[in-house]
Amino acid sequence: MKVEIEDVLFWMDAIRNSEDRYRTLESFWKGQVRSKVWLSDQLNNWYIGLKDIVIFGGWNGVLASILFNVRPDIKSITSVDIDPTCEEIANTVNKRYEMEGKFKAVTADMCNYKYNAHLVINTSCEHITQQQYETWLSNIPEQAMIVLQSNDYFELDEHIRCATDLEDFVEMSKINVTWKAELQTEKYKRFMLIGQKIMD
């Protein structure tokens, strides 16, 4: 994967201007970046026609920037995170696309956020309870494609809903799964599902 040098410079601006540089740098840890590149590669391999994307648990906006580099035909990405410190950082990381009107970072609770999208991504499934997840799932537009990621990294206190393995993640995710896989990183396994809502 190639990243535009202008985007890399904006990444450095985001880190340099951040009040908590170490926390911002966590977005660029090897496991974090590998998981996001893995996701973008899979979408690029088989899902055509990415238009409007909403990323929940968007954190500092690195996934959005990677997706724009892999798929320049993307119309828009909205990155939603409940942490208010993420919004300015994410807008800086994606400054080129923000200036073009293609990117927006939003501070909001994913359980209450209303939207329309062709593709919905949540790479932070381990950070929310099952009840929060199911509330969030119920708000997803019916025809949207869904991409979910979680892991088996139970050691972090903020990881309150990890999966023991890929099948455990499938079971707790409650979607019609069309693709599933796992990625071994240095410290944990990353799980990913692609699918759609189960319709009543």
Residue ranges and their predicted role:
Residues 60-73:
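Conserved SAM-binding loop of SAM-dependent methyltransferases across substrates and taxa
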Residues 116-132:
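A short SAM/SAH-binding and catalytic strip from SAM-dependent methyltransferases
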